[in-house]
C-alpha cells in the first residue's frame, strides 16, 4: 500500500485534465511533487468514450488546442502541436470537429500525462485497474482497486472522483416503462447507444433506415445533438422514406449567442439572467452550440435555413407521465432518451464503514462551487473532490457564466482551465506533503 497526496479515480477527459490544469497554471511540479496516482479502468487514458461518438463537438477545434499554449505547451505537452492528431484538429480550428478527431488528440494528451506520472518518483498511473471502493476518514482515504493481479489498496490525502457519467434512461415514476406497456412494439434507445452504434453511420446499410417517426426525449445538448445527427442523415437521403423527428422537452432550448445584440437581431427571447457578466455572452454555459444549435435555430425559425421536413419540437411542461408522453411522441416507432447523466461512482464508505449518501438537491451530485461533494445528512464528504460528467461544478464568480444557469459546468476546456484551477486549489489545499509511503 502506497500513500499519495492525490488519488485520481478515472483517467478520462476530466481526470487527465486535473494534471493538465496544473501544467496550464504553471504548478505541475508542485502538484506532482506531493504525489499523484491516476487509476483508469481501460488501457488508455485521456479520451474516455469520445473516440466512439459519431457526432460533432460542441466546442470549436481551437478550444481543444489551447492547452498547448503557455507552460503546458512548453512542458508537459511539448511537441504535441506538431503531431498528426493536432494538425488534423487544427484544420477544424474554426469549426465544430467530429468527436473521433477530438478523441485522437485527447488520447495523445493522456499518454503524456501517464508518462509524466510514471517517470516521477512520487507518482504513478495504473491502467486496466478498476476502482471498487473508497473509504474516507479524518486523516486519509483508502482506495480499493481491482486489477489483473487481484485487489490492491492505496491511500490518499484527497481522492478525486472523475469516473465519468452513467446515462439516465428512465423517468420517475417509471413513466417510460409504462409508455412501452401502452405502446407494444415501441422501441427505446438511449442517446449514447445511437451515437456510438455504427448502424447509425451515414454509410451503414441499417434497418433503422426504415423508421418513419422518431421522438427524442430531453431538451439539453445531448438531445439536440442526436436530433442534429438524424437531420444530417435525413438531408443525405439516408432514410428509406419521409421521416419525422420530434424533440420533446420541458421548455424551449437555450441558444448560445456571442452577444445580446446578436441574439436580439435574430429575434431570440432572453432574460438578463441568461447573460454572462464578464463575457457578455448569452447562455454561455447552458446554451446549445454547434450542429445542435443550428438545428434548434432552424426548428424555432431563427435561422435563414429551414430544418429538414418533418423535424420539430414539442414542449411538455407538465408532469412527464406515460399518458402525457404517449400524446407527445405520437405514432413514433422509436424513442431516444437524452435525459442527462449521473456520476459513475464506486462504493463510498465513511470511517465507520457505513455507506456515504451524497446530497443530490437537483438530481445530480452536489459538488457546489469548489468540487467538494455534500452529504445528504449535511456537511461535506471528507477527503473527496469531484467534477466531470454527472458531477460538474456550478458557476461562480471565478468561472463566470450566466446567473440563471442552474446546470453543471462540463467540457474539456473548462476542465483544463476555469474548473481546473478550482479543483487544483482544492487538491493543493491539503497540508500533508511528507512522504507517507
Swiss-Prot record:
Protein name: CMP-5'-(3-aminopropyl)phosphonate hydroxylase
Function of the molecule: Hydroxylase involved in the biosynthesis of the phosphonate antibiotic FR-900098, a potent antimalarial agent that acts as an inhibitor of 1-deoxy-D-xylulose 5-phosphate reductoisomerase (DXR), the first enzyme in the nonmevalonate pathway for isoprenoid biosynthesis. Catalyzes the N-hydroxylation of CMP-5'-3-aminopropylphosphonate (CMP-5'-3APn) to CMP-5'-(N-hydroxy-3-aminopropyl)phosphonate (CMP-5'-H3APn). Cannot use CMP-5'-N-acetyl-3-aminopropylphosphonate (CMP-5'-Ac3APn) as a substrate.
Broadest EC class assigned to this enzyme: oxidoreductase
Coiled-coil spans in chain: none
Keyword Cell division: no
Keyword Oxidoreductase attached: yes
Source taxonomy: Bacteria, Bacillati, Actinomycetota, Actinomycetes, Kitasatosporales
Entry's transmembrane regions: none
Catalytic activity of the protein: CMP-5'-(3-aminopropyl)phosphonate + NADPH + O2 = CMP-5'-(N-hydroxy-3-aminopropyl)phosphonate + NADP(+) + H2O
Record GO terms (molecular function): monooxygenase activity
GO biological process: antibiotic biosynthetic process
Pathway: Antibiotic biosynthesis
UniProt xrefs under InterPro entries: FAD/NAD-bd_sf
Domain of life: Bacteria
Key words, A-Z: Antibiotic biosynthesis, FAD, Flavoprotein, Monooxygenase, NADP, Oxidoreductase
Cofactor entry: FAD
EC number(s) reported in the record: 1.14.13.-
Amino acid at each position: 500500500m502506497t500513500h499519495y497526496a492525490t488519488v485520481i479515480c478515472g483517467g478520462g477527459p476530466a481526470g487527465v485534465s486535473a494534471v493538465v490544469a496544473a501544467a496550464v497554471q504553471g504548478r505541475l511540479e508542485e502538484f506532482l511533487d506531493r504525489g499523484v496516482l491516476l487509476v483508469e479502468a481501460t488501457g488508455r487514458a485521456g479520451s474516455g468514450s469520445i473516440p466512439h461518438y459519431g457526432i460533432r463537438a460542441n466546442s470549436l477545434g481551437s478550444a481543444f488546442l489551447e492547452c498547448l499554449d503557455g507552460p503546458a505547451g512548453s512542458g508537459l505537452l511539448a511537441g504535441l502541436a506538431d503531431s498528426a492528431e493536432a494538425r488534423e484538429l487544427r484544420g477544424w480550428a474554426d469549426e465544430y470537429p467530429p468527436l473521433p478527431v477530438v478523441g485522437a488528440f485527447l488520447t495523445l494528451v493522456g499518454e503524456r500525462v501517464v508518462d509524466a506520472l510514471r517517470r516521477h518518483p512520487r507518482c504513478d498511473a495504473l491502467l486496466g485497474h478498476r476502482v471498487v471502493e473508497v473509504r474516507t476518514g479524518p486523516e486519509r482515504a483508502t482506495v480499493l482497486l481491482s486489477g489483473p493481479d487481484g485487489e490492491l489498496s492505496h491511500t490518499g490525502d484527497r481522492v478525486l472522483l472523475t469516473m465519468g457519467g452513467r446515462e439516465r434512461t428512465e423517468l420517475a415514476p417509471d413513466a417510460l416503462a409504462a409508455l412501452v406497456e401502452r405502446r407494444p412494439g415501441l422501441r427505446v434507445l438511449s442517446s449514447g447507444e445511437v451515437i456510438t452504434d455504427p448502424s447509425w453511420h451515414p454509410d451503414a446499410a441499417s434497418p433503422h433506415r426504415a423508421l418513419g417517426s422518431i421522438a427524442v426525449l430531453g431538451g439539453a445538448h445531448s438531445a439536440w445533438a442526436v436530433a442534429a445527427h438524424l437531420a444530417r442523415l435525413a438531408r443525405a437521403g439516408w432514410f428509406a422514406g419521409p421521416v419525422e423527428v420530434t424533440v420533446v422537452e420541458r421548455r424551449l432550448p437555450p441558444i448560445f449567442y456571442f452577444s445580446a445584440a446578436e441574439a436580439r437581431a435574430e429575434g431570440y427571447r432572453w432574460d438578463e439572467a441568461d447573460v454572462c457578466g464578464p463575457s457578455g455572452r448569452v447562455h454561455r454555459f447552458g446554451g446549445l452550440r454547434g450542429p445542435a444549435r443550428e438545428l434548434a435555430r432552424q426548428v424555432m425559425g431563427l435561422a435563414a435555413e429551414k430544418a429538414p421536413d418533418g423535424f420539430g419540437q414539442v414542449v411538455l411542461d407538465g408532469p412527464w407521465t406515460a399518458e402525457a408522453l404517449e400524446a407527445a411522441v405520437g405514432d413514433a416507432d422509436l424513442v431516444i432518451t437524452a435525459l442527462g447523466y449521473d456520476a459513475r461512482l464506486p462504493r463510498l464508505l465513511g470511517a465507520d464503514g457505513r455507506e456515504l449518501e451524497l446530497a443530490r438537491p437537483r438530481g445530480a451530485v452536489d459538488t457546489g462551487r469548489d468540487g467538494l461533494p455534500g452529504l445528504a445528512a449535511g456537511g461535506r464528504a471528507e477527503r473527496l473532490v469531484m467534477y466531470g460528467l454527472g458531477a460538474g461544478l456550478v458557476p461562480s464568480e471565478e468561472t463566470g457564466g450566466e446567473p440563471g444557469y442552474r446546470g453543471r459546468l462540463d467540457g474539456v476546456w473548462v476542465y483544463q482551465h476555469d474548473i481546473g484551477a478550482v479543483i487544483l486549489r482544492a487538491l493543493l489545499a491539503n497540508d500533508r506533503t511528507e512522504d507517507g509511503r
